[in-house]
């Protein structure tokens, strides 16, 4: 009986996750050998949450590296990525820090992973 009650809950959870993934990914933009999600996640996140959120999109979606984020900055017009925000990269600086890209001027710096920044997922193809 418990299994029968659990099944609808799992289906609702899957539907909500897949709808969220569709909203984030949208129509991906191609930059070189990368697919870039059309939209940011709706809120800023800590680094570990950002990594997990990208991976939870499935199908190889992930947080971009520091160098990949810089490529996105260089192509912000093509992507339609007009932002004055900081975005997480997957590149760690030291155990407690990771690199972010500032899309206001292209600068990169490292911040503590407990801080929050915006997130844009990518995947290679």
Predicted feature residues:
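Sec-dependent N-terminal signal peptides
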Residues: 4-12
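Alpha-helix boundary/capping residues
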Residues: 11, 57, 75-79
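Short hydrophobic alpha-helical membrane-anchoring segments
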Residues: 11-19
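Extracellular adhesion/carbohydrate-recognition regions
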Residues: 18-61, 97-100, 104, 112, ...
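C-terminal, surface-exposed recognition/capping segments
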Residues: 66-125
